[in-house]
Amino acid sequence: MKILFVDESGDHNLSIIDPSYPLFVLGGIIIEKNYAEEELVEIVNKFKIKMFGNSEIILHTADISRNRNGFERLIEKSFREKFYLELNALIKTLKFTAVACVIKKDTHLSRYGLAALDPYFLSLDILVERFCMEIGNTTSGGVIVAERRDPTLDHELDLAWLNLKIQGTHHMSAKKIEKRIIGLNLRSKSENLVGLQLADLMVSPIGRFVLGKSVKEDFKIIQSKFRCNKEGEWRGYGLVILPK
C-alpha cells in the first residue's frame, strides 16, 4: 500500500492575496506504507538525535526558519549550515515520489472571476489524480494523510474529499478514486509523523521556485524526486502549475 502525505504553503482563500506570495501550494510525497512506518522513521530519528539529541523534535518549516520550538540553536551560523547540509543529504537518500500543484491565485482569479474554483479543491484534484495513477489498478492500494488544523479547515478538507468521491476529477472517475484510495485521514502534528514532516519541508521550496527565486539545493533534490514520465519530464506530471 502507498501513502500520500500532503501539506500546503500559502492561503487558499482567493479574497486574501499576499503580493509577496500570491500562491497556494499543495504538495505531497508518495511513499510505500511499510517503508514509511519502519525504515523511514528509523533513518529520520537518527538524524534528529544526531542534530538535536532527541527524536521528539518535529521538523516544521515555520519553526526551523524562526529558530523556535527546539530549533533555537539554528541561530548559530555554523550549526545552521551543518543542519541544512545534513538535512539535504538525508532527503536525497530517502525513497519517495514528490507531487505538487501550485495555484497562481492572482492569475487564477483574474482569469475565472466568480467562477474560480477554490485553490485547495483544485490542487487536491490534481494530487489525487496523480496518486491514483501511481497506485494503478490495485484495489485499496492507497491512503491520503493530511495534517489536522482547525475544525473549519478540517471540515473543508473533508468536503473536498467527499466531492472527489462523488464527482471524480477531469481525468479520474469517482469509481476509480473510491476503488483505489481507502480514505483521507487527518492526523495531529503532535503525533510526530515523519511523512507529514517531509511533506511540510517540500512545499516552501516549490513555492520559491514558482516565484522565480534562486534555486537552492533543497529544490534540486525535490526536483529529482518529482513524479515524471518515461522521458524524465516532471512538469505536468509531478509538478502542475495553474493556470497554464
Predicted regions and their residues:
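Phosphate-ester processing/binding pockets and catalytic centers
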Residues: 1-244
